[in-house]
């Protein structure tokens, strides 16, 4: 249970640090890196809500978790609950620098339409990271191997509500799967290739549930191809490959170049394929070092709030809070609610539903 609570907290810590990093990059006050060099680094930092607010990544992840912890009778009821919470949430997001595709996706939701509440049209603009950053809790809720079918369905439908584009909603499947793998205790190097093995099941589900699959088809293989190239680059594509290989020189500047290369928009972590990819890469390189994870996932020149949210949550599931400076989470915005959601997700995940 403690790691479930840690996951909800550290996803939010990663968001606050990464979001703060983006905000400081866009201001005259200098980067977080410069700020930390003047003090004792992360150990001296206190993430108070006034100075370190969270972004829409946290708000939407909490909305997903709150829906998952209600007493729904069937998945359709769960989806209606998600729609209701997303629509309520998005009205309050203006001060949180929301992902534009999240706003646009939520505008298509119909909470008052019982039958069609969560059915949204295909969107060319729905490829952003926002589906991936709100879905880790789905993997926490349905982490058991025998719940894989449910995890696939819920993560895809949750993703499609706001990001109805394969690059977007496959991002939510990816982060949900990674959360489930962390809880199952799977080796980190397996996660990427095991996720790729699930994609045919996801495609089969979509063929059955999406009426006009043709318009999705041309975009479907982009996500898969990007991940295949990534795993080959790190030499962990095959089951026999057990150690990720990184370049000899992989400092902050080189990482930013690499993150841009993985992106299709020149800004690392902007879309549903590369936000989880950067988080995963950071986890592979960091081991149990929280400081190293922050350097790689929270303090780069891309969408560091998105990658920080995903990486922080998964780190919590893998390692808990032991190596994380307490100042980062003791005064964190929404701390009590986040811990309660972690507790509830743990309890419900051990019960059958």
Swiss-Prot record:
In terms of InterPro entries, this protein maps to:
ADP-ribosylarg_hydro (IPR012108), ADP-ribosylglycohydrolase (IPR050792), Ribosyl_crysJ1 (IPR005502), Ribosyl_crysJ1_sf (IPR036705)
The main location is: cytoplasm
Keyword Ribonucleoprotein in record: no
In this UniProt entry, the residues modified to Phosphoserine are 27
Q: Which GO terms describe its biological process?
A: cardiac chamber ballooning; cardiac myofibril assembly; protein de-ADP-ribosylation
Per its record, what are the GO molecular function terms? Answer: ADP-ribosylarginine hydrolase activity; magnesium ion binding
Q: What GO CC terms are in its UniProt record?
A: sarcomere
- Compartments where located: Cytoplasm, Myofibril, Sarcomere
Annotated keywords: Cytoplasm, Phosphoprotein
Spell out the family assignment given in the record's similarity comment: Belongs to the ADP-ribosylglycohydrolase family.
Report the protein's function.
Required for myofibril assembly and outgrowth of the cardiac chambers in the developing heart. Appears to be catalytically inactive, showing no activity against O-acetyl-ADP-ribose.
Name the record gives this protein: Inactive ADP-ribosyltransferase ARH2
